[in-house]
Amino acid sequence: AKQIGSDKFKLTSWPGYTLISNNAKRTWGKTLPAEWFCEAHGPSVFKAILTGEPYQIRALICNATNPVNSYGDSKMTLAALKKVEFLVTVDYWMTPAALFSDYVFPAAGALERPTIVTHYGATDSVMGGRRAIQPKFDRHTDMSFWRMLGLACGQDPANWPWETEEEVYSYIIAPLGLPCTDWNDFVNNIRMYYPPLHQNKYVTRGGFWTPTGKIECNSTILRELGYPGMPTYLPCAENDIDNPELAEEYPIVLTTGGGFMPYHHSEHFQMQGMRYLYPDPYYSINPELAEKLDIEHGDWCWIENGRGRCRQRALLTPQMKPGVINA
């Protein structure tokens, strides 16, 4: 099946990944890990669940994510979670997605899994740590979950030769030729590996990681994908120029995602220390706009658009542009 969203969001899906990865192989000698630039577009997946276009998606696995709070248009996302035929959640918490899931699997905690940091293969450094304890009860690490699922679905066991993360990580670091026997030995005696610094690597490796081999201010790959090669400003889809009637009903521009940083999506709200620092939800508004609307710092306000509304307290700050709020 064709990757959902790859026809519109080309850079972060198969078309962009293929072009970028080919250049990575030319300069690095290996392809770019699929973690980068190789994703189905999330909102398009939810739309496909609801509409059946371009094809019907019948199953969804939510691994360490709470889609209701992680994507825009929460109502559409929630409707998709309710409609999909088979929903599985792997997480620490009983998230809204978990409440609608057919199966919920508890994930192993940070102390129950070994750690490797390679930035998904995008850098040439390796850092690691040992697990403190084996997973308790019926908790599983990500690798354990996907390995068992793959084997249960009939995948070739030869594709899953490792039974533990330590075996996988030992395999990953083996080509480095480091003076260690396995992953635990690496963690105990090396822990962090950075290769020797080489200046002017672009000379010996055939240039930079671009089709031209040069630093590109005008991206060849973006142009090949049908986008402008240079950064171009485009207003939001629902702007006052293209939608003057909508602007009359909703005259303030809403931006999101710039909230209190220890909170990310739905993370850390259960932590007493975080709630002590930030017990209530706040939105940011310029003092000039607040004065026009007779809003004072700390006032509870309704924030509303055509998709829904929420109630938050006002945080007056000159950092916000007049006419724009962040919630």
Question: Language model features by range: what are they?
Answer:
Residues 45-49, 142, 161-162:
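Short, charged beta->alpha transition segments
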Residues 131-147:
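Alpha-amylase-like alpha-glycosidases and glucanotransferases acting on alpha-linked glucans and related
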Residues 143-159:
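Non-catalytic, well-ordered alpha-helical segments in soluble enzyme domains
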